Curated annotation (Swiss-Prot):
Residues 346-589 form the Reverse transcriptase domain. Keywords: DNA replication, DNA-binding, DNA-directed DNA polymerase, Endonuclease, Host-virus interaction, Hydrolase, Inhibition of host innate immune response by virus, Inhibition of host RLR pathway by virus, Magnesium, Metal-binding, Multifunctional enzyme, Nuclease, Nucleotidyltransferase, RNA-directed DNA polymerase, Transferase, Viral immunoevasion. Its EC number is 2.7.7.7, 2.7.7.49, 3.1.26.4. It catalyses: DNA(n) + a 2'-deoxyribonucleoside 5'-triphosphate = DNA(n+1) + diphosphate; Endonucleolytic cleavage to 5'-phosphomonoester. Residues 1-177 are annotated as: Terminal protein domain (TP). PANTHER family: POL PROTEIN, RIBONUCLEASE H. Terminal protein domain (TP) is hepadnavirus-specific. Spacer domain is highly variable and separates the TP and RT domains. Polymerase/reverse-transcriptase domain (RT) and ribonuclease H domain (RH) are similar to retrovirus reverse transcriptase/RNase H. GO terms for molecular function: DNA binding; DNA-directed DNA polymerase activity; metal ion binding; RNA-directed DNA polymerase activity; RNA-DNA hybrid ribonuclease activity. Multifunctional enzyme that converts the viral RNA genome into dsDNA in viral cytoplasmic capsids. This enzyme displays a DNA polymerase activity that can copy either DNA or RNA templates, and a ribonuclease H (RNase H) activity that cleaves the RNA strand of RNA-DNA heteroduplexes in a partially processive 3'- to 5'-endonucleasic mode. Neo-synthesized pregenomic RNA (pgRNA) are encapsidated together with the P protein, and reverse-transcribed inside the nucleocapsid. Belongs to the hepadnaviridae P protein family. This is Protein P. HAMAP family: HBV_DPOL (MF_04073). GO terms for biological process: DNA replication; symbiont-mediated suppression of host innate immune response. It comes from Hepatitis B virus genotype D subtype ayw (isolate Italy/CI/1992).
Length: 832
């Protein structure tokens, strides 16, 4: 007969009708009983022949991939002009006085941040924008390209101009070595930037002065026209200098970009004055030390003999006859002036050698499940987290639930601040740019994917043998719709581009660490400036607490002004005032303790409504179920031990079948949630100890002892002794010398015992007492006559490593690999 829910509940001692604890509880450690219960609940039948269920509610497992949804009307979010002040340490010291060593160290980490992976793998530009939406390839291309352009204009990305130079918008930092600011700075840096002339090329040095003179005379116009070149050679100057060295086409460092001035062959008359008709010719040195731009008259023998000029793919359609009703020339002829082929930033800097490649792909998704109108850029830099050369990201303190409750459970009024684009506040050193490259190969290659009869014969430059091979109805309709949104920018976005991150990207494991260090240091400064208030952060989520609403408002004003003075951008529309119940990290934290937020409780209820009974569920689905239930497990009677059968099926990669009793048990557990309370400081006066054959308690002057009917593993015996001490004394602070009991993780014990002990010891705090000083040591060995001196050990609630102050442990030195010993604990859950 299957085990009923009521019988199972009585077995776990969850009802008041249970017998004496000293008799009932040791039975739950019996392996035979645990095996019989597992068989009755059908928990151990891992090998089933019935087909697995691969979907439960919104949880999907194997063979049921969710198709991403593309929104053609996504709005690209706007980014403010984010510029974190370089003298942030000085500004903080003006605000609060001298900084602590830890605050200063954390702020120095991000001024600027550095990223040097062991190995960087470069991918072709074709893989710059991932074909995440095969049905919307062109639309997704232009939307992503527009997002990248927005980031560049906001100063978040560098734009690669040549192998050794990049341009960007916004305010420069001191470590961004300026490349061009008029003739003077070019002359100062010319010795280090221009290529070393070969023997006998005195003509180059002879003409250097005239080039500089030309630059200074033409001023801004010349700098803009030739802004991405390092040496500027006027088209009228004859030259006898041979090329310094053409980089081999197979080396992977050739720039695939349509030249800017080539576009002027198809520009309107008024634009010809602005963009003179001079063909450009780009060369890379094989040594990587020099990149020069040489200008020659369009018909010169030199320019034709070296390399054919590839004009702008987009503007070529202007002078071609329409091939059909859906020819792209019809779109190109809609506008007389399509603007330049390229744009340049306000500043040009020198960068390490950067190939015309990408190191990660990008694609767009919804900003979040609640905001599908705006898009979010996903950057895949997972190459740095995989393989033999993966980077070990630094670890940082994250508060667990009990630490968070100890810190924030109070009678304060709360509000939370929203930091706009938190990651994009932290600047990266330009030396990291070659490792964090994104970009695109130009729309012509994407067009080639759509067209079945297209022939992409010239792989090196991405141009087509026949221009009109790319024309199709699908492409025409897509571009006409995009023209409504982007207008002349369609031309700009159709060109290849390589961009590197100037601020830390979200797709690298280093970024969360740096953001956590930054916000924790800022909150530490705020706490010291306002000692009667509380400021706390996790990543970009910052909360402020004060004793009254009026006090909180004045604190909010002062802190907001301070953060704005540092260059930190806040979103005032998303500032939330919580009253006395703070919503933070998925919890509701009040003076009573912590509980899960309401939307998580609703998800759990929905999950139990959808979970089928007596049907094997794919272990991938079980992973997702356990992820949801595990978040709320500390608020239930039996906690994590109740989920151990599910953990076992995931570990063995087998299906799991919910029996009616086990489902009812879990359902009741999660329908009645108990808050996790704040730990209070106090004195420990109740002690427990055990041997494999007996247990002993010390409660003030009173001593108690007992024996087990059969010898038990020492950790199990110690856990039983702690349960007896809690049950008999009612004390919520216990002293023990067992590290496993101290850890309060009961998933390593026999399943039934772990569930029962979690409920008995819920809300109990433990203090470590050495065996030599433990008053319960003698009773556990059967000696009641001896009396040790009375102990009163102080208990102080822990906040983990997340201290309210910036005094964190110093950076540890590199230790050798830790030796792993076999654990003496029993395996938590073994299927019968």
């Amino acid at each position: 007969m299957p085990l009923s829910y009521q019988h199972f509940r009585r077995l776990l001692l969850l009802d008041d009708e249970a017998g004496p604890l000293e008799e009932e509880l040791p039975r739950l450690a019996d392996e035979g009983l645990n095996r019989r219960v597992a068989e009755d609940l059908n928990l151990g039948n891992l090998n089933v022949s019935i087909p697995w269920t691969h979907k439960v509610g919104n949880f999907t497992g194997f063979y049921s991939s969710t198709v991403p949804v593309f929104n053609p009307h996504w709005e690209t979010p706007s980014f403010p002009n984010i510029h974190l002040h370089q003298d942030i340490i000085k500004k903080c010291e003006q605000f609060v006085g001298p900084l602590t060593v830890n605050e200063k160290r954390r702020l120095q980490l991000i001024m600027p941040a550095r990223f040097y992976p062991k190995v960087t793998k470069y991918l072709p530009l074709d893989k710059g924008i991932k074909p995440y939406y095969p049905e919307h390839l062109v639309n997704h291309y232009f939307q992503t390209r527009h997002y990248l352009h927005t980031l560049w204009k906001a100063g978040i990305l560098y734009k690669r101009e040549t192998t050794h130079s990049a341009s960007f918008c916004g305010s420069p930092y001191s470590w961004e070595q300026d490349l061009q600011h008029g003739a003077e700075s070019i002359h100062q840096q010319s010795s280090g930037i221009l290529s070393r002339p070969p023997v006998g090329s005195s003509l180059q040095s002879k003409h250097r002065k005239s080039r500089l003179g030309l630059q200074s005379q033409q001023g801004h116009l010349a700098r803009r026209q030739q802004g991405w070149s390092w040496s500027i050679r006027a088209g009228t100057h004859p030259t006898a200098r041979r090329p310094f060295g053409v980089e081999p086409s197979g080396s992977g460092h050739t720039t695939h970009r349509a030249s800017k001035s080539a576009s002027c062959l198809y520009q309107s008359p008024d634009r010809k004055a602005t963009y003179p008709s001079v063909s450009t010719f780009e060369r890379h040195s094989s040594s990587g030390r020099a990149v020069e731009l040489h200008n020659f008259p369009p018909n010169s023998a030199r320019s034709q003999s070296e390399r054919p000029i590839f004009p702008c793919w987009w503007l070529q359609f202007r002078n071609s006859k329409p091939c059909s009703d859906y020819c792209l020339s019809l779109i190109v002829n809609l506008l007389e002036d399509w603007g330049p082929c390229d744009e340049y930033g306000e500043h040009h800097i020198r960068i390490p050698r950067t190939p015309a490649r990408v190191t990660g792909g990008v694609f767009l998704v919804d900003k979040n499940p609640h905001n599908t109108a705006e898009s979010r850029l996903v950057v895949d830099f997972s190459q740095f987290s995989r393989g033999n050369y993966r980077v070990s990201w630094p670890k940082f303190a994250v508060p667990n639930l009990q630490s968070l409750t100890n810190l924030l459970s109070s009678n304060l009024s709360w509000l939370s601040l929203d930091v706009s684009a938190g990651f994009y506040h932290l600047p990266l050193h330009p030396a990291a740019m070659p490792h964090l490259l994104v970009g695109s190969s130009g729309v012509s290659r994407y067009v080639a994917r759509l067209s079945s009869n297209s022939r992409n014969n010239n792989n090196q430059y991405g141009t087509m043998q026949n221009l009109h091979d790319s024309c199709s109805r699908q492409l025409y309709v897509s571009l006409m719709l995009l023209y409504q949104n982007f207008g002349w920018k369609l031309h700009l976005y159709s060109h290849p581009i390589v961009l590197g991150f100037r601020k830390i990207p979200m797709g690298v494991g280093l970024s969360p660490f740096l953001l956590a260090q930054f916000t924790s240091a800022i909150c530490s400064v705020v706490r010291r400036a306002f000692p009667h208030c509380l400021a706390f952060s996790y990543m970009d989520d910052v909360v402020l607490g004060a004793k009254s609403v009026q006090h909180l408002e004045s604190l909010f004003t002062a802190v907001t002004n301070f953060l704005l003075s540092l260059g930190i951008h806040l979103n005032p529309n998303k500032t939330k005032r919580w009253g006395y119940s703070l919503h933070f990290m998925g919890y509701v934290i009040g003076c009573y303790g912590s509980l899960p937020q309401e939307h998580i409780i609703q998800k759990i209820k929905e999950c139990f409504r959808k979970v089928p009974v007596n049907r094997p569920i794919d272990w991938k689905v079980c992973q997702r179920i356990v992820g949801l239930l595990g978040f709320a497990a500390p608020f239930t009677q039996c906690g994590y031990p109740a989920l151990m059968p599910l953990y076992a099926c995931i570990q063995f990669k087998q299906a799991f079948t919910f029996s009616p009793t086990y489902k009812a048990f879990l359902c009741k557990q999660y329908l009645n949630l108990y808050p996790v309370a704040r730990q209070r400081p106090g004195l420990c006066q109740v002690f427990a100890d055990a041997t494999p054959t007996g247990w002993g308690l010390g409660m003030g002057h009173q001593r108690m002892r007992g024996t087990f009917s059969a010898p038990l593993p020492i950790h199990t015996a110690e856990l039983l002794a702690a349960c007896f001490a809690r049950s008999r004394s009612g004390a919520n602070i216990l002293g023990t010398d067992n590290s496993v009991v101290l850890s309060r993780k009961y998933t390593s014990f026999p399943w039934l015992l772990g569930c029962a002990a979690n409920w008995i010891l819920r809300g109990t705090s433990f203090v470590y007492v050495p065996s030599a000083l433990n008053p319960a040591d003698d009773p556990s060995r059967g000696r009641l006559g001896l009396s040790r001196p009375l102990l009163c050990l102080p208990f102080r609630p822990t906040t983990g490593r997340t201290s309210l102050y910036a005094d964190s442990p110093s950076v540890p030195s590199h230790l050798p690999d830790r030796v792993h010993f076999a654990s003496p604990l029993h395996v938590a859950w073994r299927p019968p």
